[in-house]
Design a protein with these regions (language model features):
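Short, surface-exposed secondary-structure junctions/capping segments
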Residues: 51-52, 111-124
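Short, surface-exposed linear segments at secondary-structure transitions and domain or protein termini
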Residues: 105-116, 169
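Solvent-exposed loop/turn segments at secondary-structure junctions
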Residues: 85-87, 95-96, 104-108, 123-127, ...
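Solvent-exposed, polar/charged alpha-helical surfaces in well-ordered, non-transmembrane soluble domains
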Residues: 3-4, 39, 43, 47, ...
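Structural recognition of the beta-strand scaffold that forms the well-ordered cores
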Residues: 78-80, 88-90, 97-99, 118-121, ...
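A structural motif detector for short, solvent-exposed N-terminal "entry" segments of globular domains
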Residues: 65-109
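Short glycine/threonine-rich beta-strand-turn micro-motifs
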Residues: 1-77
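Exported/periplasmic cell-wall-interacting domains
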Residues: 14, 114, 130-203
Length: 203
């Protein structure tokens, strides 16, 4: 019964259709979405069986999304279009911010993954480091003013070392997977985003 409930309500990890800013429809999956708390629901079911009390209540979720009706990411989210090398921010259905970007370097297999994610947190004044080498140094160390991760070590940040964004830069001189942004644009995005906000990445 609980597994049937999960199959009905869970959206995390499922494939969903996203209508992009450019007008395409793309199929995306990812960790963002609703997820029933199967342990809690099982415990509640056992309790109801033991007490004989049948009660109507809300289903308990271990992970929540923005909306139960329509697209579960709702109408406030960030969209990263790899093909256009552009980021869009929607708030309550209105486009309120956008910027050119540089994503993961395709030629070095640092391609940024597609998917539906949520912003983990945001932090100002951060040093981003690559993998640690045997001698104790790091593959790279980059100071950023605005750090907004959403997929492990992948996130939005300013890239003051770049003078150009957009175009085909990502194919030969892209990032290690992050979404590089102009400093002034990153500052404005930083002011808008919040923990748990949906982030949709697509080709």
């Amino acid at each position: 019964y609980i597994k049937a409930l999960a199959a009905k309500y869970d959206t995390a990890g499922t494939t969903r259709t996203f209508h992009t800013t450019s007008g395409k429809e793309v199929a995306l999956t990812g960790p963002y979405g609703w997820k029933i708390d199967q342990t809690a629901e099982t415990d509640n079911l056992v309790l109801m069986a033991q007490t004989g009390i049948n009660q109507e209540r809300e289903v308990q979720f271990s992970q929540q999304a923005a909306s139960h009706s329509g697209a579960d990411w709702g109408n406030t989210y960030a969209e990263v279009d790899f093909g256009a090398q552009h980021v869009y921010m929607y708030e309550n259905g209105a486009l309120t911010w956008d910027a050119p970007c540089v994503t993961g370097n395709v030629s070095k297999n640092y391609t940024t993954p597609e998917g539906i994610y949520s912003l983990t947190y945001k932090q100002a004044d951060r040093v981003l480091r690559g993998a640690k080498r045997a001698d104790g140094t790091y593959e790279y160390e980059s100071h950023v003013d605005y750090w907004m991760p959403f997929n492990g070590g992948i996130g939005f940040h300013d890239a003051s070392w770049r003078s150009k964004f957009g175009g085909t830069i990502y194919q030969y001189s892209g990032s290690h997977g992050c979404i590089n942004l102009p400093v002034d644009k990153a500052k404005l995005l930083y002011e808008k985003v919040y923990k748990g906000m949906p982030v949709l990445c697509h080709n």
